[in-house]
Structures are given as structure tokens and as C-alpha cells.
Amino acid sequence: LADLRIVRHIKDGAEHWNTWRDSTDLAEIDLQKVDLSSLKLRGINLSETNLSRVNFSRTDLTQANLSRAILQETVFVNANLQGANLSRALIHQVNFNQANLQDVNLTNTDLRSLELRGINLGAANLSGADLRGVNLSGGSFKNIDFSGANLSGANLQNADFGGANLSNANLSNAKMSRVKMRGALLTRANLWGASLDFADISMAGCLMANFSETILNKAILNKANLGGAIFSGAQMVGAELCNAFLSDASLSMANLTKANLSEADLSYAYLFRAILSNSICIETKFRNAEMQEVDLSMAFLKKANFAIANLQRAYFGGADLSEAVLIGANLTQANLTNANLTNIVTESTIWTDANLQGAIGFSP
């Protein structure tokens, strides 16, 4: 049990405690199981202290330092921890019910045992936090810093991460159906194998993010910055990518059937064997794109720009390419049977062994 003389020091207030603590051996400080409820301890330094089973209910711990503290079965019911530092604290079976955790620092902290849903985190810092397999479904985490956090295998379904910073975060195999990430930052985030169907990732910054093998069916990525992102093998059926920036992105063998890519920029993108059948690509930019064996059957490609694109063995069966730009494009062995080629723009276009049977509006 804690030494009552030590307890008296803390009950004399944060300023007195901090001064006393500076001249005391930390090994002598034991506050386990102490009742410190309803106290005013703003700015108190409790770092590296064993606070197991301490009762902080209704206590003011604003700007308190609890970094590297041991918080096993500690109670913070209705406590005010706004701006507190809990970085690298050992947190296990802690009760934060109705606590104020706005702007709290939880960097590099293992939070796997913590129930974060329903907690007011404000603009908390969870960068580098360990959140593997946690359940955050339905929670609101807008504008929170999760940069470098490990959320692999986590349940984020229906959660709101609008404006959050998830750059360099690990979200591999996470359950993210209907997640809201509008305007979030996902630069270099790893989302390999994540389920993101019906997710809203519009206007998000996803430069160099890894979406390989993800499920993005009916997801919304309008106006997202996806430059250099990897979508290899991703399922993106019916996805919305209007005005999205996908320059240098890799979409090899991605399934974009019925997706809407109108006015998107896929310049220099890699689309080997990608499926875009029945997709809508009005005024989409495919300049310099690598599109060998791509499936664009029945796609609506009006005014799409394929200048200098590599379209060898591409399949355009029944596609509408009216007013499309094909200047310098390589259509060697491409299949354009029954395609609409009305008013296409061609110059230095390569048609070697292309199949134009039934095509209308053009004859090379």
C-alpha cells in the first residue's frame, strides 16, 4: 500500500508535489490503490509512477504528465485529462468513462486494451500508437493524429476519420466498410488487404499509399490525391474517382468495372490488365499511361485523352471513344470491334494489326 506521507504530498497540490518529487527518489514513490478523486492536480508530474488501481474520478488532471506511468485498472471516470501527456504509458483495463481526453498525448502508447469509442479525444495525438485489432467502429476520430500508428486488423467500420492524419499508418487487413476519411491524410499509409467498400475517401491526400488487394467497391474517392498510389489487384467495382489525381499510380489487374473516372488524371499510370469495362471516363487523362491488355469494353470514353499511351492488345469492344484523343497512342493488336470512333483525334497513332471490325466513325 502507498505510504500515507507520500499521499499527503500529492494532496497538497500539484505545485507542492512537483517540487517535492524533484528531490525524491522515484523508487520510493508508490501510489497504488490510492483514492485521489475530486482533486485539483492541474499540471502535476506523475511520469514513470505506478498508478495501478488509483481512483482519479472527477479529478482535474489538465496538462498532467503521466508519460511512462503504469496505469493498470486505474479509474479516470469523469476526470479532466485535457492536454495530458500519456505517451508510452502502460495502459491496461483503464476506465476512462466520461473522461475528457481532448488534446491528450498518446504517442507510442499500447492502446489495444482501451475502449476508445465514445471518448472525447478532441485533437489528440495518437501517432505511433499500437491499435492492432482494436474496435473503433462507429467512433468519431476527426482531425486526430494517427500518423505512424499500427491499426492493422482493426475494426473501423462506420467510423469518422475526417481530416485525420493517418500518414505512414499501418491499416493492413483493417475492416473499413463505410468509413469516412474525407479530407484525411494517408500519405504512404499501408492499406493492403483492407475492406473499404462504400468508404468515403474523397479529397483525401493518399500520395504513395498502398491499396493493393483492397476492396473498394462503391467507394468514393472523388478529388482524392492518389499520385503514385498502388492499387494492384484492388476490387473497385462501381467506385467514384471523378477528378481524382492518379498520375504515376499502379492499377495493374485492378477491377474498375462500372467505376466513374470522369476528369480523373491517370497520366503515366500503370494499368496492365486492369478491368474498366462499362466504366465512365469522360475527359479522363490517360496520357503516357501503360495500358497493355486493359479491358475497356463498353466503356464511355468520350473526349478521353490517350495521347502517347501504350494500348497494345487493349480491348475496346463496344466502347464509345467519340472525340477521344489518340495522338501518338500505340494500338498494336488492340480490339476495337463495334467501338464508336466518331471524331477521334489521331496523329502518329499506331494501328498495327488492330481489329476495327464493326467500328464506326473512323477508318485508318
Model region roles, listed by residue range:
Residues L1-A2:
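Terminal targeting and flexible regions in eukaryotic proteins, enriched
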Residues R5-R8, H16, W20-P364:
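Tandem repeat scaffolds
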